[in-house]
C-alpha cells in the first residue's frame, strides 16, 4: 500500500508518514471519517512494517462532505464564521450566503472539497476531540498532524490525554 513514494522514503530510514488531506487516502479536509476502510487498511499495513501513521486533522475549517454541515449551520455563527458567502459552486448552490469559504480542491469524478471556516472556540471543540478519540481507538493512528493550532492550553491538555490513553 504505497502512499506517494513512502516506501522509497522508508528505504532511506523514514518511519513516520503524515497523511495529508486532498490525497487519495484522506481526500477531504478535516473529516477523515469519510474514508474509514481505506485508512484502517493503510494504518494496519504500515504498522505491520514497523512504521507509524499520523493523520491531518485540524479545527480551522470543515469540508462540505461533513454529514453535520446543515445542522451546524442551524446554530448561527457559533460553529461557522460569518462572511459574505457566494463562494464556490457547492457553497452557492447549498448555502448561498452568510459563511466564509475556505479550502477548495477538485476531487476525482468532477466533485470538489469546498470547506467552510470554523470558529475554533465553540462547542465544536468537543466534537473534534471526540472524533480524535474515535480515530485513535478505531483507526489506530499514532498521532495527528496540525499545521495551524489555535487551541488554548486546556484543549491541548485534553488532546494530550487522548493521545496518551491510546498511544
Which positions does each model-derived feature cover?
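Acidic (Asp/Glu)-rich catalytic clusters
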Residues: 6-13, 40-50, 136
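Conserved structured core elements
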Residues: 3, 28-29, 33-40, 122-129, ...
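Active-site-adjacent "subsite" loops/lids of carbohydrate-active enzymes
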Residues: 44, 55-139
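Active-site and adjacent substrate-binding regions of carbohydrate-active enzymes
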Residues: 46, 120-167
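Aromatic-lined substrate-binding rim segments of carbohydrate-active enzymes
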Residues: 23-55, 155-164
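Catalytic domains of carbohydrate-active enzymes, especially glycoside hydrolases
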Residues: 2-25, 138-139
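Hydrophobic faces of well-ordered beta-strands that scaffold small-molecule active sites
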Residues: 1, 17-19, 53-57, 144-146
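Active-site beta-loop-alpha junctions enriched in small/polar residues
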Residues: 22-24, 58-62, 149-151
